[in-house]
């Protein structure tokens, strides 16, 4: 875990309210890190509705396979997360580790192994010794608390420099419900599902199918629109749980994602997902600047997003941002290599509110002083208009610094 907190970290953290129906505990198992917690147990007092989206990597981790197999039941009683070891590319040993963890968690909580969900993050390719923490899950269940969100977020960190938490409230049929979420991620971040690891819990009463629809729709403009280094993790897991405790306040169960009562909840959920996703980018390994890339005028929205990601993932664009150089030529390069339709002579490019290029050449009113002032900011916007259609998209990334190389060059040591 990095020592210095990212300069882009939040200046303050929200007060995370206790959420009815869920309790958490952490433990220090010494999986990779010393003198810190590295295991999280999240317990649902009653079966919670569950939804999930996972990595599209063709080399998924053993916990991802395990979660996918259990997701169809629609019910969760516990989640076990460890940091320091991804339990990915670990063969039969990896599967055995998930089975031991699930068996131990089920015994600790008093449920079936089909109601257990697992996630691991850390080094890929090294066997996970689940016996280091499987034996303490019973004790963790006993001491689990409802008001433990910050500590839960800390336990799942790897190269993160700060815990990522967020909370929102919404209304369903006149009943106020709460949504809390935690995330981890700083490297191996690219949009192809969700984020690295993220767990969101609400006390709303929503059936699993509706919950899944809400989550699947929410990841597109949020977690699927952020990138740090274009590398999609083998372990990406985003799960949404609904404890149903709001039924005690009179909330009538939601059975369909088309239910009009979900309007406020959907907006709050999407806002929380975006908040967590942007916190991940702000903690990008070695990051010193946050970059928002917006593409307009593409053939369609899908084309706009592909172009935006081509820009956001370009090492040359990202290093130019790190060097505070408004090098629009690199943006042009990234547009051209995206594989989408573009007309060089129609392109227009802005850094912040300063137009630097138009009609395929440098803006005749270009101001070096104005552009330099923009590039010195911590939060930078880049806008590109393709000039061909109505497609639009926005993605977020960070700069690429020497610290990123140092962090990843030393990661296994």
From Swiss-Prot:
The lineage of its organism: Bacteria, Pseudomonadati, Pseudomonadota, Alphaproteobacteria, Hyphomicrobiales. Pathway: Amino-acid biosynthesis; L-arginine biosynthesis; L-ornithine and N-acetyl-L-glutamate from L-glutamate and N(2)-acetyl-L-ornithine (cyclic): step 1/1; Amino-acid biosynthesis; L-arginine biosynthesis; N(2)-acetyl-L-ornithine from L-glutamate: step 1/4. This is Arginine biosynthesis bifunctional protein ArgJ. GO terms for cellular component: cytoplasm. The record marks 121-122 as: Involved in the stabilization of negative charge on the oxyanion by the formation of the oxyanion hole. It comes from Agrobacterium fabrum (strain C58 / ATCC 33970) (Agrobacterium tumefaciens (strain C58)). Pfam families: ArgJ. Belongs to the ArgJ family. InterPro entries: Arg_biosynth_ArgJ, ArgJ-like_dom_sf, ArgJ_beta_C. It is found in: Cytoplasm.
